[in-house]
Amino acid sequence: MNLKNIAAIVTGGASGLGGATAQALAAAGAKVAVIDVNVAAAQEMALKIGGVAITCDVADADAAEQAFAAVAAALGPARVLVNCAGVGNASRVVGRDGPTGLSGFEKVVRVNLIGSFNMLRLAAAEMSKLDALDDGERGVVINTASIAAYDGQIGQAAYAASKAGVVGMTLPIARELARYGIRVMTIAPGLFLTPMLRSLPAEIQQSLGDSVPYPQRLGMPEEYAALALHIIGNRMLNGETIRLDGALRMAPR
């Protein structure tokens, strides 16, 4: 897909993987909607790339519908959706005070899995009504999972489950949407230098980077963005999850 003047939505687009992707899409000629719960950061990113900023809880059905309507009004209907919005927590199933509460588990699954599906379903419905481009293509959806979907560590039950759900829905949805010319892909990043990791002490960042076989460092958000753009440009990539992790396999803890 040629991205020039194509409307694209990036959730979690104010920073990190989403921020790098929003910038890369804009540099490729796309009209980008930055969706994020951080209003100020979303506005700053939108101003930087010449896009629009929209505040939205991705797991809220009504808010998401309003966000898509706002994007269509400002940029036209989107042919590209990149889901980068996500949260994480660390909690053992059984702790010193007994079983962990459900609220933390529910929040992570709600944002990471339900939020991704919510945005995908609305994007797909909109894309299915658009005129077909080359090869009958109408749109591309890229979800973000994690290597935790495969190598979840102790304390990552909620996060790993939510990301495994994203991986699990990729193929069946891609098969379903194939009739419309809509592709669905997922990227499963390893250890990337996102705002969360940037907040850690330098020695911990170095230790985490050293655990990656090659390249022996943390991934850069721009490398995620580069893969997202490659997926958009290569129509044979469909229904698959790509690990972007430098051959890293996480230890139990």
Residue ranges, per PLM feature:
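Alpha-helical segment proximal to the catalytic Tyr-Lys
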Residues: 125, 174-176
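Residue(s) in the substrate-gating loop at a strand-loop-helix junction
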Residues: 146
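Conserved mid-core segment of classical short-chain dehydrogenase/reductases
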Residues: 88-106, 125, 129-135, 155-158, ...
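Active-site helix of classical SDR
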Residues: 120, 162, 170
